[in-house]
Amino acid sequence: MATIDVVNLSGEKVGSFELADEVFGAVNEDLLWEAVKHYRAGQHRGTHATKNKKLVSGAGKKLWKQKGTGRARVGSIRSPLWRHGGTVHGPQPRSYDYAFPRKKLLGALRSALAAKLADGKLTVVESFDVKEPKANAFRKTLAGLKVDKTALLIESAENKNLELSSRNLKGVELVAGNAVHPYHLLRYDRAVIARPALEKLQNSLKKAASKRHAEVA
């Protein structure tokens, strides 16, 4: 069982944390791709719309009689055959979301955490004990934690000072431990997670992995 250093907000080592092999194991890139695809599909607004024959402006009156004019027969000026007529089979508002198995999602989350660990981009802090909600001060704190690009902050409970300190920092996002998604971990360069949040997340993922192995056996 591997371990990872636990540091304080000053970057000083204050302990270590044991990482479960069931969680921080092999990386399944195919599963990560599926999870990211599903997440982005859910984010798609799907508000695109074109005007069909029913919605486009114009009267429905027949332009000229069916026979006797020598011209091609025609119905409404809103016909798709006419300029400014309705669009046929054009995009309409819809949801792009689809069902994604929970087992796959948890497996992808394990792979995302394992990938961050393998890349040396996972930092565990004892706690996000932010004294004052100051963005500049917190930016220096992140620099001390070797965050030089984008960062995902994972906290176990509501932390108002942390929220206020990080919300205006470019490239920094704060999420709760029970709401973290593989997409979040892959999107940001470094993940900084509080020890209590990692404990809860690891226990949850470890339990799910053990249950899956029991079903297979």
Curated annotation (Swiss-Prot):
Cellular component GO terms, alphabetical: ribonucleoprotein complex; ribosome
Pfam short name (any one): Ribosomal_L4
Single Gene Ontology MF annotation: structural constituent of ribosome
A biological-process GO annotation: translation
Keywords: Ribonucleoprotein, Ribosomal protein, RNA-binding, rRNA-binding
Keyword match Transcription: no
Record-linked InterPro entries: Ribosomal_uL4, Ribosomal_uL4-like, Ribosomal_uL4_dom_sf
Self-association and partners: Part of the 50S ribosomal subunit.
Classification via PANTHER family: 50S RIBOSOMAL PROTEIN L4, LARGE RIBOSOMAL SUBUNIT PROTEIN UL4M
Function, in words: One of the primary rRNA binding proteins, this protein initially binds near the 5'-end of the 23S rRNA. It is important during the early stages of 50S assembly. It makes multiple contacts with different domains of the 23S rRNA in the assembled 50S subunit and ribosome.
NCBIfam families: rplD_bact
Family, similarity comment: Belongs to the universal ribosomal protein uL4 family.
Identification of the protein by name: Large ribosomal subunit protein uL4
Organism: Koribacter versatilis (strain Ellin345)
